[in-house]
Design a protein with these regions (language model features):
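Amphipathic alpha-helical polymerization modules
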Residues: 1-163
Length: 163
């Protein structure tokens, strides 16, 4: 028997990270919609490009050495028990639009939410396929599987404090 068959595929771990990231980003984007009338409000987002680069590097490392290694960055930190903390960043483009063209600002936020939702749905479907989960499994079931016992450990203290 091939010993590699006993090692779980790291694709599932990457998909779980994507699902967690998209949930955290959804919260931030919702704040951007709900707090537009707050004086001095600064729209934020999660560092999407940075997160994609971290995942690309982890997958490249996996292909080279058969181990999945997530490296911390200035705004993304990986911890024990599969946790990650992400520092939201100010969204200067959104801030500018909020000041000059509120309709464009709202459209930007809605488009980001739609893109984020699509990314989440794709990752969930791939995870279902990867893990052999039955097609009838609901999003709630996936969320329970992904979040574990303490989903708040997947966000940064800065993100939690902002909510």
């Amino acid at each position: 028997m091939d010993a590699r068959l006993l090692i779980p595929d790291n694709v599932s771990e990457v998909l779980v990270k994507i699902i967690r990231f998209t949930e955290l980003r959804r919260r931030i984007l919702h704040q951007n919609l709900h707090h537009v009338d707050q004086p001095g409000f600064t729209p934020r987002d999660l560092p999407v490009r940075e997160f994609a680069e971290v995942l690309s590097e982890a997958v490249a490392e996996h292909l080279r050495s058969h181990r999945l290694l997530f490296r911390d960055t200035a705004t993304i930190t990986f911890g024990p028990n599969n946790t990650m903390q992400i520092q939201p960043v100010a969204d200067s483009r959104a801030r500018s639009l909020l000041r000059t063209d509120r309709d464009e600002y709202m459209e930007l936020q809605v488009n980001k939410l739609l893109e984020n939702s699509l990314n989440r749905k794709i990752a969930q479907e791939l995870l279902r396929h990867q893990c052999g989960v039955c097609p009838g499994m609901t999003d709630g079931d996936i969320n329970e599987t992904v979040a574990g016992d303490n989903s708040s450990t997947d966000s940064s203290p800065h993100l939690d404090a902002a909510e």
